[in-house]
A protein has these predicted regions:
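Short coil/loop residues immediately preceding or within conserved phosphate-binding loops
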Residues: 7-9, 30, 80
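A short coil-to-beta-strand element that immediately follows conserved catalytic motifs
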Residues: 61-69
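Conserved Nudix-box catalytic region and its N-terminal flanking loop in Nudix hydrolases
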Residues: 19-55, 141-148
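Conserved N-terminal beta-strand and adjoining loop/helix that marks the start
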Residues: 1-20
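NUDIX/MutT-family hydrolases
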Residues: 95-127, 145-148
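Active-site-adjacent beta-strand/loop module that shapes the phosphate/pyrophosphate-binding cleft
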Residues: 73-93, 122-124, 130
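Short, well-ordered beta-strand micro-motif
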Residues: 14, 84-88, 106
Length: 148
């Protein structure tokens, strides 16, 4: 089969020197500290979607987000793709939203926080140039992942 149903979302690492914007997500299905982001609306460009989601969740207006990797997996005959972006270009005042509390955090301190599931290894895709994919796969009934 050459066609599969696909759902697109995004995450963005907003950098200011050694600090990054994080959100303590309140959603029960994926709670914990992560980067801001969300769903791509039908017909919306990927870049416009990450700019919109970041502004909705943080109050910051980002510019020039650069695609730096993906997270993907297949489940229930659908593929889920999370587009990873990063940027150093932003303006505005940081503010929390109904999605969760947001703040600037030193990137070196992230492993000490209560991160979202597998966020510590996802961070490697954002920061290591030789990695571009965080791929979940099933082995029997167990979910595993590979960094590629």
């Amino acid at each position: 089969m050459r066609v599969e149903k696909t759902e697109f979302t995004n995450m963005c690492m907003i950098c200011d020197g050694s600090r990054v914007v994080v959100i303590d997500r309140k959603k029960q299905d994926w709670s914990g500290v992560t980067f801001p982001g969300g769903h791509v609306k039908p017909g919306e460009s990927f870049t416009d979607a990450v700019i919109r989601e970041v502004q909705e969740e943080t109050g910051l207006k980002i510019r020039s987000p650069q695609l730096c990797g993906i997270k993907d997996w297949c489940e229930d005959q659908r593929r889920f793709v999370v587009l990873f972006y990063k940027t150093t270009h932003f303006e505005g005042e940081l503010r929390s939203s109904s999605e969760g509390e947001v703040w600037w955090e030193d990137i070196a301190n992230l492993p000490n926080l209560k991160l979202s599931l597998d966020m510590n290894d996802m961070l490697r895709v954002f920061t290591e140039e030789d990695l571009s994919e965080f791929f979940y796969y099933q082995e029997g009934s167990e979910w595993k992942y590979a960094l590629k």
